[in-house]
Amino acid sequence: MIMSKEKLIKSIREIPDFPIPGILFYDVTTLFKDSERLQELSDIMYEMYKDKGITKVVGIESRGFIMGPILATRLGAGFIPIRKPGKLPAETMEESYDKEYGKDTVQIHKDALNENDVVLLHDDLLATGGTMKAACNLVKKLYPKKVYVNFIIELKELNGKQVFENDQDVDIQSVLSL
């Protein structure tokens, strides 16, 4: 059964005032709890990247750890986690970035990627783009051949793609736009 993108969008739970008042939170976990929705999402993303030569899928903590390994398996690629500081056991590299309420940092193992890798960076949602931009900068420090960026959802009104306007070598796509 092929499910439309509209049906996928309708199945996303909206939670007002989470995590703080005034924020409308889009809960993508509703896409994962039903096998048909999960399969459809997996199929759509596989079709987007099946001919790109992806060698590593890099998922951002924590919801990038759900679809990231599924995509890696479907694409015949390895999976690499990007995590918060202190969570990876071997030698790491890090990138710090500003958030609306402070600073944050992401890390990757120094030996996670090399110049022969074609990378698909994945996270669940593109809002302002800060986390993914930091992750992209971090991945680029390991000199992969090409970097693709993928989101399940892009919140268009927040213009998160703007932080990538100087990264014309980065291909950015989302499955669903809200």
UniProtKB/Swiss-Prot annotation:
Localization, UniProt: Cytoplasm
Enzyme class of the recorded protein, top EC level: transferase
Listed pathway(s): Purine metabolism; AMP biosynthesis via salvage pathway; AMP from adenine: step 1/1
Keyword Transferase: yes
Superkingdom assignment: Bacteria
CDD domains per record: PRTases_typeI
UniProt KW keywords: Cytoplasm, Glycosyltransferase, Purine salvage, Transferase
Cellular compartments per GO CC: cytoplasm
InterPro entries cross-referenced by the UniProt entry: Ade_phspho_trans (IPR005764), PRibTrfase_dom (IPR000836), PRTase-like (IPR029057), UPRTase/APRTase (IPR050054)
GO BP annotations, alphabetical order: adenine salvage; AMP salvage; purine ribonucleoside salvage
GO molecular function: adenine binding; adenine phosphoribosyltransferase activity; AMP binding
Main location: cytoplasm
Catalytically driven reaction(s): AMP + diphosphate = 5-phospho-alpha-D-ribose 1-diphosphate + adenine
EC number(s) given by UniProt: 2.4.2.7
Similarity annotation: Belongs to the purine/pyrimidine phosphoribosyltransferase family.
Function: Catalyzes a salvage reaction resulting in the formation of AMP, that is energically less costly than de novo synthesis.
Family matches, as PANTHER family: ADENINE PHOSPHORIBOSYLTRANSFERASE
Name this polypeptide is given: Adenine phosphoribosyltransferase
Organism whose genome encodes this protein: Bacteroides fragilis (strain YCH46)
